[in-house]
Amino acid sequence: TPQPVQPAPTPQGPLEPQPVQPPPAVPAPGQPLVPQQQQTGVPDPNATLAGKGTDTSDVAEVTLSPKPVLVLSGQTSWDQGFQKLSDSFKALRAEAQRAGLAVAGRPLTLFVETTDEGFRFDAMLPVAIPPGGQAPTVGADFRMSTSPAGAALRFLHQAPYDDIDSTYETITAYLEAKNIVVKDAFLEEYVSDLADPGDPNLEINVYVQPK
């Protein structure tokens, strides 16, 4: 049986004017400006950049909003790539905890450069910036930045990480068929944790951005 709607509580006295929030403070010189967290309340550590896909055969046109991210750059061989990324995310989470930053989304990897031997990457962890928008102080190996933003195509990988090459072959074929030219750097978002490269239920969003 539907419950009756409760009336809004009656104020016990005259409403007090709310203080005006000061503008965000400017970060110290050399620190990149990071967008202030738009959401209120507790940050969601499982939030994705543009929702979740449900079918690996679907290609979604999405718009990525910039998020403050804690970044750890690195490079690795293809054979060691999965373990290197997994270790990078553990390091990012530990640094976020040390710096008092709440995790505000699923981890990301921006593949900056790829070769036959391996790749250079920026591992990213979305975080909530404390009120005031000041750039937090982080360790020497880390930096604050923003996640890629703008129009993108989202492809869904639901299979072991060992099989991700097949997803990229599908992406390449789709882009060629549609005559879409994209930026060289592509972005992976790990809806599932990178624990086992053979996990058949691993879920990854792959974003490519048209030029």
Identify what each model region corresponds to.
Residues T1-K211:
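A solvent-exposed interaction/effector surface
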